């Protein structure tokens, strides 16, 4: 189980990313449309003044049950070993073990 402080930090990052999403997207569109370099620098400075944690690249997918940041399956929102345990216990409908 991940520390609660790390899970809380990740939730805080998600809120910041949602808050600044439109601002970041609009400023990136402006940068691509503006021809002069000096105006691009001004817009880039505005983009840089937004909080660091508002960038979507700083987000991690975490396991829904344990908060583990690695080996996550997007379809289930679970880490690999929790997914395996739940499939063995028949807790995930439609998921089957492969055998050949």
Curated annotation (Swiss-Prot):
Assembly mode: Part of the 30S ribosomal subunit.
Matching Pfam families: Ribosomal_S14 (PF00253)
UniProt GO molecular function: rRNA binding; structural constituent of ribosome
GO terms under biological process: translation
Protein's cellular compartments: Plastid, Chloroplast
Keywords: Chloroplast, Plastid, Ribonucleoprotein, Ribosomal protein, RNA-binding, rRNA-binding
Role summary: Binds 16S rRNA, required for the assembly of 30S particles.
Gene3D superfamilies with a match to the protein in the record: 1.10.287.1480
Gene name for this UniProt entry: rps14
GO CC annotations on file: chloroplast; small ribosomal subunit
Disulfide-linked positions: none
Family: Belongs to the universal ribosomal protein uS14 family.
Recorded superkingdom: Eukaryota
Name by which UniProt lists this protein: Small ribosomal subunit protein uS14c
């Amino acid at each position: 189980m991940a520390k609660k402080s790390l899970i809380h930090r990740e939730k805080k990052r998600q809120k910041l990313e949602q808050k600044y999403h439109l601002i970041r997207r609009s400023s990136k569109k402006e940068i691509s449309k503006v021809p002069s370099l000096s105006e691009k620098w001004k817009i880039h400075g505005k983009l840089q003044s937004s909080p660091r944690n508002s960038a979507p690249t700083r987000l991690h997918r975490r396991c829904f049950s344990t908060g583990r940041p690695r080996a996550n399956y997007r379809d289930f929102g679970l880490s690999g070993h929790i997914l395996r345990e739940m499939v063995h216990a028949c807790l995930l409908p439609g998921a089957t073990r492969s055998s050949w």
